UniProtKB/Swiss-Prot annotation:
Domain PB1 residue range list: 92-180
Organism: Arabidopsis thaliana
Gene encoding the protein: IAA34
Entry text on domains: The N-terminal half of the protein contains two conserved domains I and II. Domain I includes a slightly degenerated ERF-associated amphiphilic repression (EAR) motif which seems to be involved in the activity of transcriptional repression. Domain II is required for the correct degradation of the protein through the SCF-mediated ubiquitin-proteasome pathway. Interactions between Aux/IAA proteins and auxin response factors (ARFs) occur through their C-terminal dimerization domains III and IV.
Protein name: Auxin-responsive protein IAA34
Protein localization: Nucleus
Record carries keyword Metal-binding: no
Lineage: Eukaryota, Viridiplantae, Streptophyta, Embryophyta, Tracheophyta
Length: 185
């Protein structure tokens, strides 16, 4: 059995009082053969969004839904914090990460991490398949290193400054081979 349209079109309407009370009421009108065909469409004057429905047009069901629950709230992930300046801190701390030899970069939220080690773990998950031995960032035997561009436009080695200072100044991240890591780029 295939799904079909409901037998009676449903129209959402809200009166002025309902707007003030933030309540949503679902009402419907059963169309008939002799009724105005425009009467079943939401743009019809009979179904203006502020038209007060009465029981003469059919039943009224109060679903008890608050319009406030339907409004979207701004979502902040657990590690994000509010920054009033600099365009919400460059879209909540997301920075672009590129790796030498790859065309496509990725974005990470540095505010979701509490240290260099958790950032390195996420970058290993994203880019670790590019090397047989993995990235192993911040380890002496690694063939890769992580550098970042700060707010002054200078490229620096990640890990040389405390974490809190790093997340305040990082604008871009780049994974390079150690032997190719000659600054600036």
């Amino acid at each position: 059995m295939y799904c079909s349209d409901p037998p009676h079109p449903l129209h959402l309407v809200a009166s002025d009082k309902q707007q003030k009370d933030h309540k949503l009421i679902l009402s419907w009108k059963k169309p008939t053969m002799d009724s105005d065909p425009l009467g079943v469409f939401p743009n019809s004057p009979k179904y203006h969004p502020y038209y007060s429905q009465t029981t003469e047009f059919g039943g009224v069901i109060d679903l008890g839904l608050s319009l406030r629950t339907i409004q979207h709230e701004i979502y902040h992930s657990s590690g994000q914090r509010y920054c009033s300046n600099e365009g919400y801190r460059r879209k909540w701390g997301y920075v672009k990460v590129t790796m030498d030899g790859l065309v496509v970069g990725r974005k990470v939220c540095v505010l979701d991490h509490g240290s260099y080690s958790t950032l390195a773990h996420q970058l290993e998950d994203m880019f670790g398949m590019q090397s047989v031995s993995g990235l192993r960032l911040f380890q002496m035997e690694s063939e890769f290193c992580l550098v970042y561009r700060d707010e002054e436009g200078l490229w620096r080695n990640a890990g040389d400054v405390p974490w809190n200072e790093f997340i305040e100044s990082v604008e871009r991240l780049r994974i390079t081979r150690r032997n190719d890591a000659v600054l600036p780029f």
